[in-house]
Design a protein with these regions (language model features):
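Short intrinsically disordered, low-complexity coil segments enriched in acidic
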Residues: 1-3, 445
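N-terminal, motif-rich segments that launch catalysis or mediate targeting to/interaction with membranes
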Residues: 3-264, 282-439
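Disordered, low-complexity "stalk" and linker segments at domain junctions of extracellular
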Residues: 440-546
Length: 546
């Protein structure tokens, strides 16, 4: 548990601190320095990212990196709280959101809340889990990270304040869903506001900037390779191993409270597991960029551009079970295009939790190479080595021990790579770039489905949805294999008074780029749901779905 800072950090002397935008370095006037002892703090305003943390880049020493995006807290809560937990072989499983997990310091949290807090808000910034030299050391590092949430007394109040801010994120995403908008648009509107508050809650911020100095939240983000690729895999294995051993202790003691602790540890570990499904975390060589680009801050900074590309356009993923699907990245978990990825994540997290109970119930431990969740997770090597057809060219990649860059950074389809590139010049190319869309990208349709005025199938209501006083509307997306567009506009809501189950006219793709369409339905006040896959030539659909 050493290395955890819980109170306000000692503030640096700010009288000779100059805070300026990074781009001012490249302007005609430059940055005016008041004296030889002045400290320059460079900050960055968003150019392309949906949301990223605003972090100072000190002129010297370049010790910490630019935080890179991750699944948002609300997404982790939803993933974790939909999991089923068992406490007895004779009892039915319980939805995780109904289960209060009691931690040693008195905190009571749900599985999803712990998954949201793990790694992003709690951990030891200077001791990334995956940096442990051995499997045992990684388990020990995970335990220290978990204890920073579960054992430290100060976390009782702090975690509640973090979650209170996170609730605003959740409310914004929920409202977007009800409005029929894509939730990532809500995250876009929030900007950096929540990150500023989280930085202050975790000991950072000052009158100069809410993001300077760094609190634990931003320090963790600056060394967050535990959330990327092979490092996320190592972090999950360490945490899941620790949780399984805790389940064995619970079995030996017969204490259900000890099983709660095992589930809590596993929820913390599942944060890293779910990162293995976030496209912007799968193939970004996060640690290699940090280690090879000088200063390290700059390497962390340019990592985010690749993260954002992969998150926005998604990657084709495959796993050991033979599944192939397209997954998108942070802030897109609830978007209509990420349905297939949500199913894979849910399966992996459920397998992870089930193994904790199996260890408790049977007294046997699986070996790390047989962990069930890892058969569901993306095959990292296949994606990194471009063995999966359908993915656009990576911005950065390790090839034969060299850190390569896409030759034309603005062309997502440029497979040419170069090794003679520099961090600062690459940043200048990226900071205002407008990359083209990848091959196979499908534009959202311009028209909405329409309801036939005389096409209603019945006047008999049927619960839970086809009831008087309800209203329904429809939208469609274009599909070609694993490529799918965002949905087009929604039809107007049709009031359901004495008519139910309509007949629809569904727009077709006149461009010929799609081979099928997905039809979505939304009842007023509810969430959009995928109800049908339609062949390219089908123009009529009768909605008999409940």
């Amino acid at each position: 548990m050493s290395g955890m800072q819980t109170g306000p950090h000692a503030q640096p002397a700010l009288a000779t601190t100059v805070v300026a935008d990074l781009d001012a370095l490249f302007s005609v006037d430059g940055i005016k320095i008041p004296g030889p002892d002045a400290r320059v703090v460079l900050v960055l305003d968003g150019h392309h990212t949906i949301k990223y943390h605003r972090l100072g880049l000190p002129a010297k020493p370049p010790a910490s990196g630019k935080p890179v995006l991750r699944f948002e807290g609300g997404e982790h809560i939803a993933i974790g709280d939909n999991t089923l937990l068992r406490f007895s072989a004779d009892s039915a499983p319980i939805e995780a959101w109904k289960v209060a997990l009691h931690l040693p310091n008195g905190l009571t949290l749900s599985y999803g809340q712990i998954a949201a807090l793990g790694g992003d808000f709690y951990g030891i910034p200077e001791r990334p889990i995956a940096d442990g030299a051995t499997a045992q050391e990684r388990v020990e590092r995970f335990a220290a990270a978990f204890d920073s949430l579960a054992v430290l007394p100060a976390s009782r109040d702090e975690a509640g304040r973090i979650l209170a801010v996170m609730q605003r994120e959740i409310a914004a995403a929920n409202q977007a869903i009800k409005d029929g908008r894509q939730p990532h648009e809500a995250y876009d509107q929030l900007g950096d506001s929540l990150s500023e508050e989280w930085n202050k809650i975790t000991g950072g911020g000052s009158f100069v900037s809410p993001m300077f100095p760094l609190g634990r939240y931003l320090k963790l983000a600056a060394s967050n390779w535990d959330h990327f690729g092979e490092w996320a895999l190592l972090a999950y294995i360490a945490g899941h191993t620790g949780a399984l051993h805790q389940a064995m202790k619970a079995r030996a003691s017969g204490d259900v409270g000890q099983l709660e602790l095992a589930y809590a540890m596993n929820a913390f570990a599942d944060h890293f597991l779910t990162d293995l499904f976030s496209a912007g975390h799968v193939r970004v060589p996060r640690k290699a960029i940090k280690d090879n680009v000088t200063p390290a801050d700059l390497g962390s900074l340019i990592s985010r551009f690749m993260h954002d590309e992969d998150s926005k356009y998604g990657l084709v993923l495959r796993n050991a079970q033979g599944d192939t699907w397209r997954g998108y990245g942070d802030k897109r978990y609830f978007d209509t295009i990420d349905v297939a990825n949500r199913k894979q994540i849910a399966e992996a997290v459920q397998k992870s939790a089930d193994e904790v109970f199996q260890a408790f119930n049977t007294g046997t431990l699986p070996t790390p190479d047989s962990y069930g969740a890892l058969r569901v997770a993306a095959d990292l090597q296949a994606v990194v080595e471009d063995q999966v057809p359908g993915n656009f060219a990576p911005l950065f990649a390790m090839r034969n021990g060299k850190l390569m860059r896409r030759a034309d950074v603005s062309n997502l389809n440029d497979q040419a790579q170069i090794d003679n590139w520099w961090g600062w010049s690459t940043y200048l190319l990226l900071k205002n770039y407008t990359p083209n869309k990848p091959s196979g990208y499908l534009e959202a349709p311009a028209a909405a489905p329409s309801i036939h005025a005389d096409g209603w199938q019945t006047q008999v209501p049927s619960p839970p949805n086809w009831l008087p006083g309800h209203a329904v509307r429809y939208a469609v997306s274009m599909v070609n294999g694993l490529n799918e567009s965002y949905i087009g506009p929604w039809s107007d809501y049709a009031e359901l008074n004495d008519r139910f189950q309509p007949t629809l006219t569904v727009p077709v793709d006149n461009s010929g780029k799609s081979t099928s369409r997905h039809l979505f339905r939304q009842f007023r006040g509810g969430s959009p749901e995928l109800i049908a896959a339609l062949a390219a030539g089908t123009t009529t659909y009768i909605d008999h779905h409940q």
